[in-house]
Amino acid sequence: MAKITRRAYAEMFGPTTGDKLRLADTELIIEVEKDYTIYGEEVKFGGGKVIRDGMGQGQQLAAEIADTIITNALIVDAVAGIVKADVGLKDGRIWKIGKGGNPDIQPGVTIPVGAGTEVIAGEGMILTAGGIDSHIHWICPQQIDEALMSGVTTMLGGGTGPATGTYATTCTPGPWHIHRMLEAADAFPMNMGFFGKGNASLPGPLKEQVEAGVIGLKLHEDWGTTPAAIDNCLTVADEMDVQVAIHTDTLNESGFVETTLAAFKGRTIHTFHTEGAGGGHAPDIIKAVGQANVLPSSTNPTRPYTVNTIDEHLDMLMVCHHLDPAIAEDVAFAESRIRRETIAAEDILHDTGAFSMMSSDSQAMGRVGEVVIRTWQTAHKMKVQRGALAEDAGKGNDNFRIKRYIAKYTINPAITHGIAHVVGSIEEGKLADLVLWKPAFFGVKPSLILKGGMIAAAAMGDANASIPTPQPVHYRPMFGSYGKALKTSVTFVSQAALANPAVAALQLSKPLVAVQGCRTVQKADMVHNGATPAIDVDPETYVVRADGELLVCEPASELPMAQRYFLF
């Protein structure tokens, strides 16, 4: 039998079982857990290679073959694991994960390739599910380009543009605004969903927003997040199967964190920026991560804790929440939210799986294009400061930690907001929202972004060059971002909206997909991130303990995935 060295094999077909890779310039190491290929029967496209007529390409009709095959890709996914496989796409969905080729002459083929199949070379590349950012202020549409080019393919949030209310809160208030935003969503290669304003003491104003098309309701302290508003909002959400997101009462005007937790009455809720710098009961909203019904997320400015984190937050907060630096009370409000002790604890609670999700808080104390980067910078910092997780101990890799962190911006926000039946992981039947990365650029600069099976964006060279690669190489929209191909993206709505004639009358062009199962989600359902430690915060020193253990870590003075990759 012919043999080949591991190095030569990896250079030709990508890494295989037992091979290890470094993610970008971090200290995170992945190891391939499984390879679906049959050695000697790999498929690869190119001159003199396998995918040619009568060889790796068979004679089947379109109904029997993949529309697209991504060959020899290394999947990194919270659900699928860290596995090497061919991935077949069909009708905009992930059709099969397995072994591609020509079943007429090759053994073990699960993804037939034919004349109707396009090929994307995944050799030496990492394939992830498109990211999900569940904390979007819809301040400007240009955010969508930034998010897409960073590897995010689903954006959930609220707002109407650069209105003062949207600068501060993720709410698209009332049926008129909701319908206009649903119409605007048709123009973008992005899955989108909208939150209505959840601050009301009677159910009527909330129900009409859900019927108009929002996928959830947002309670925000700037609109008055009182116990009565919380209770009313959750009651409507339970009735109509939508999620509730909350930014709690920083000033503790209508109660303390215990008051808010009591108002939940054990019902499911997504707590935004649960550390508190982004807003919430000062100084101890972080206690919420210990509740079985609370699904906690972070926003990315505090991720990870660095020597610059505290300094940048004060001015950011003053602008975003319409505060006046000349008013002492406004300054005191801002300063109460920025605490180095709880930000440091947030790092550790992410690493232990107590914080379940990562998000941006786009243009409103968060950077929309940095959800992915900040997630992996946090993972790197924790690897350096805390060493291997118990689940990875002695294995020589960081596979479990990597699955834990990628879940924070893929499957967990999908589960939380009732869209995991469509997006959030690399599983057969889900929308083919996929991102290809060179390992050296993982988490920083993707190579290709697919939406619904079609390339929507890519790092592309000079369009007038004789080949695709000459400088300037920068991110450009591809054909999936134009015309009726925008139907490769979806707009998420409530179940009530699908039955609403007023929504049908909008004649929206992108497919509408209803959220489902939002009210039965528990912290235990958060993949690799379901820990519920008992949290204590000292009201004087802000020191945080989890199950009695002191949570302390130093700020980072240097990070990977930073200036090495960006000139400007």
Swiss-Prot record:
The annotated subunit structure for this chain is: Heterotrimer of UreA (gamma), UreB (beta) and UreC (alpha) subunits. Three heterotrimers associate to form the active enzyme.
What the entry lists under Pfam families is as follows: Amidohydro_1 (PF01979), Urease_alpha (PF00449)
What is written in the cofactor note of this entry? Binds 2 nickel ions per subunit.
- List the cofactors: Ni cation
| Claim: Metal-binding is one of the keywords in the record | yes
Q: Where does Ni(2+) 2 bind?
A: K218, H247, H273
Q: Which UniProt keywords apply?
A: Cytoplasm, Hydrolase, Metal-binding, Nickel
Protein name, UniProt field: Urease subunit alpha
Which residue spans traverse the membrane?
Answer: none
**Binding of substrate: at which residues?**
H220
- Name the species this protein comes from: Azoarcus sp. (strain BH72)
Looking up SUPFAM superfamilies in the UniProt record yields: Composite domain of metallo-dependent hydrolases (SSF51338), Metallo-dependent hydrolases (SSF51556)
Q: Which family does it belong to?
A: Belongs to the metallo-dependent hydrolases superfamily. Urease alpha subunit family.
User: Which positions bind Ni(2+) 1?
Assistant: H135, H137, K218, D361
Q: Name one GO biological process term.
A: urea catabolic process
Urease domain: residues covered: 130-568
Q: Per the record, what are the reactions this protein catalyses?
A: urea + 2 H2O + H(+) = hydrogencarbonate + 2 NH4(+)
- Per the Swiss-Prot or TrEMBL record, the active site comprises H321
Report the subcellular localization: Cytoplasm
User: Which major enzyme category is it?
Assistant: hydrolase
